């Protein structure tokens, strides 16, 4: 399978919860408000150089437990423009290479354009309160989440996509 993980529904719907349920999630509602703000979108544009962003944002929480993974892909679906991940793993138990669960970035094969290499060129461990982001580019933004080897140490994150007003050129 392309993936094995546990994921919530889209956090864009958090304001549609009944008041009793919403009262249990005030911090998540504040984070969603910040991530969806015009100011944060301007920051994303400045940092990534991604160009114009639409108002559309996707956002969900994910848990990768022992054995969970996400195979190599490029995130090109519809108008996705910037992929981002905020890591929320336990700060008292820093993530190590032995735990697995790294974000893997893949270079392209020289002989075959738009084809990722078999091996990643970089691995980034999910450090607490860190954010990874990259521009979604057809045939280039290949990445994966390495299988989680740790038995009692879940890889927790909030992740999503900022969208462009139109679909990218070169999308197949």
What are the residue ranges of the model-derived segments?
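Non-heme Fe(II)/2-oxoglutarate
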Residues: 1-46
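Context-gated lysine
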Residues: 4, 16, 24, 32-33, ...
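Short, functional N-terminal and low-complexity linear motifs
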Residues: 7-13, 51-52, 111-113, 125-127
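Active-site-proximal binding-pocket segments
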Residues: 31-35, 40-46, 50-57, 62-67, ...
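Catalytic core of Fe(II)/2-oxoglutarate
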Residues: 59-68, 72-80, 87-172
